[in-house]
Amino acid sequence: MTFDSQAYAAQLEDKVTRLRDLLAPFDAPEPTVFDSPLQNFRLRAEFRLWREGGERHYAMFSQDDKRTPILIEEFPIASLRINQLMPQLKAAWQASAALSHKLFQVEFLTTLAGDAMITLCYHRPLDEHWHAAATKLATDLGVSIIGRSKGKREVLGLDYVVEKLDVGGRTFSYRQPEGAFTQPNGTVNQKMLNWAYEALGDRSDDLLELYCGNGNFTLPLATRVRKVLATEISKTSVNAALSNLAENAVDNVTLVRLSAEELTEALNEVRPFRRLHGIDLKSYEFGSVFVDPPRAGMDPDTCELTRRFDNILYISCNPETLAANIAQLHDTHRITRCALFDQFPWTHHMESGVLLTRR
């Protein structure tokens, strides 16, 4: 593909128009638009391996044809580090039966801070020959390597990468574990964090955060409020978030492993939860709620939960479900800020954000 700036501008304008049209029924202000680098923006990549001509090649498949591989030699949308590592890793497995035997998938995870991890997935047990070859490879490439085989995992180095992002004049450090969700476009993620930081503003009350992940938004937003109650259901993400809070000396956040639906029940005093033992929900003075839900958006009950807060800061990876949730809240809240974040250039996907305030 060609990375033409005019083509990119036209595609981005199409996304702006789509978001504008979806939010028009709610009298939304004009969205602030945060663009992306045209290439080398994607910090993670996953490839299947395909045998052809007696060699294994990086391969991907189109959405329309899962049978015919597209052989990949370079991947311009991926970070420069991934593009540097791809030929080095390929040369290594071509030279080593211990590395290449029954290797079927490769995953790269990198950061703006320069960290990198490679996951190698196999249809066989990992033996001492693999361990020796992979240990040398990790040293040669300056990366952590994780071997996966039939539910087992071997870690050479660390099982996370470290990202550093500047938000509100402060640098935050993030552990991003292997296998956990991370924002793929680091440059746009940093813009998104700064927008959310500015939109929330300095407050003297408390924040409720649903779907906090590894603490991507939690860390900077916690510096804007008295204290935060954050929820997440993934164990891996919860552990990463706790590490990130400690690493950044953010001590006003309580993290609970509850779903949004369970938290709704807890706040409505439907039933008690052991995981809330020792946490006095009545001690919180919530003025704002921050939500970053999955593509399906908020379920109706969670949407109703957010209605009780004066400010709803909402980051969405699906503008259609965002619009549906806003429609449910529109009688009590209005959109006061709106933004489009081009996390996924050269695709129809977009990330968007709104600040809803009580009428």
Swiss-Prot record:
Belongs to the class I-like SAM-binding methyltransferase superfamily. RNA M5U methyltransferase family. TrmA subfamily. It holds the Pfam family tRNA_U5-meth_tr. GO terms for cellular component: cytosol. Dual-specificity methyltransferase that catalyzes the formation of 5-methyluridine at position 54 (m5U54) in all tRNAs, and that of position 341 (m5U341) in tmRNA (transfer-mRNA). The active site is at C317 (nucleophile), E351 (proton acceptor). Its EC number is 2.1.1.-, 2.1.1.35. The keyword Protein biosynthesis does not apply. The gene is trmA. This is tRNA/tmRNA (uracil-C(5))-methyltransferase. The keyword Transcription does not apply. PANTHER family: TRNA/TMRNA (URACIL-C(5))-METHYLTRANSFERASE (PTHR47790), TRNA_TMRNA (URACIL-C(5))-METHYLTRANSFERASE (PTHR47790:SF2). It catalyses: uridine(54) in tRNA + S-adenosyl-L-methionine = 5-methyluridine(54) in tRNA + S-adenosyl-L-homocysteine + H(+); uridine(341) in tmRNA + S-adenosyl-L-methionine = 5-methyluridine(341) in tmRNA + S-adenosyl-L-homocysteine + H(+).
